[in-house]
Amino acid sequence: MTKNIAQAAVKFEQWQPKIEQESYLTINSLECHTGGEPLRIITSGFPVLKGNTILAKANDCKQNYDQLRRALMFEPRGHADMYGAIITDAERDDSHFGAVFIHNEGYSSMCGHAVIALTKTAVESGVVARTGDVTQVVIDVPCGQIYAMAYSHNNVVKHVSFQCVPSFVYAKDQQVEVDGIGMVQFDIAYGGAFYAYVQASSLGLSLVPEQQEKLIAYGRKIKQAIIPQFEINHPTTAELSFLYGVIFIDDSPNQDVHSRNVCIFADGELDRSPTGSGVSGRIALHHAKQQIVLNETITIESILASSFSVRAIETVCFAGFDAVIPEVTGDAYVCGKGQWFINAEDPLKYGFLLR
């Protein structure tokens, strides 16, 4: 009988696949969250993705290794709202590294919460050499090149700001009939991904944790109603021409912030953070509606009351669209390290989802 639990615990920790178990694949990760939204940074063990661009690398993953994406995002290693980033070689000579974003449905074009976590961990781990209290990190992502700044105190990154890609309004004051909901008014804006923006109060919704299931159900229905009726074409990159999610907007009970966001994206994922690409599209929308001016900072919070600050720092013309360059600020935290074993003999090796 085991008497010394401390010794037993050490032996548990020393478990390793046996030599004859060559069917094991080991993938390592750094576990983070930004405003409550998880980010699993895949650091090693994943096959090297091929392609000259990040979009090409994402396509290589989709075509050849999608089962590993499912294994890392789905239960039992993940859950229906899991999110990840696969670190890759940079696409451009002046970038530090690249990232392919993964989730429960597949792949995304931009992820602000991931950029914040990647920037913080890149500086604190020494992937990018610290240059004093402010360090620039340049990341290639599917929608383009992202410039981020890590602001440190006593060698600890306290917050991160990043400049998003040109963000613009794609369609204003649209409406669609949604089965079981009725007529829904919405705008579509792009902030690295296309979102439909909906006033929550117009549908009787409250942006609180107690309504998460209803928010997911409504977000899914609205997205599926919009997709067949509204064609979305990115002006320069066909692979970005899709509606990524629905963002519900409402006032916040916190008078110190501008408003609250809840983003339902991919296959019914609910973002715990305010959504970096989502607030980028929102600031473009507010600017187009003359509700804010350049360099006016607003703070947007999530369903958990975690917050991002965002402002439009510049106006640009992007492929015929009046666009702005958003600057988004937030913070992230490291909450663990992972070592994931994928055993070829396991009938559930590539995971499953019950929701």
Curated annotation (Swiss-Prot):
UniProt keyword terms in alphabetical order: Lyase
Instruction: Name the reaction it catalyses.
Output: trans-3-hydroxy-L-proline = 1-pyrroline-2-carboxylate + H2O
Q: Where does substrate bind?
A: 112-113, 276-277
> So where's the catalytic machinery, residue-wise?
111 (proton acceptor)
- Would you say which domain of life the source belongs to? Bacteria
Q: What enzyme category does the UniProt record give?
A: lyase
EC number(s) from the headed UniProt entry: 4.2.1.77
Activity across pH: Optimum pH is 8.0-9.5.
Q: What SUPFAM superfamilies does UniProt report for this protein, alphabetically?
A: Diaminopimelate epimerase-like (SSF54506)
MF (Gene Ontology): 4-hydroxyproline epimerase activity; trans-L-3-hydroxyproline dehydratase activity
- Assembly description: Homodimer.
- What is this protein's function? Catalyzes the dehydration of trans-3-hydroxy-L-proline (t3LHyp) to Delta(1)-pyrroline-2-carboxylate (Pyr2C). Together with LhpI, is involved in a metabolic pathway that converts t3LHyp to L-proline.
Family assignment? Belongs to the proline racemase family.
Protein name (Swiss-Prot/TrEMBL) = Trans-3-hydroxy-L-proline dehydratase
Q: Which organism is it from?
A: Colwellia psychrerythraea (strain 34H / ATCC BAA-681)
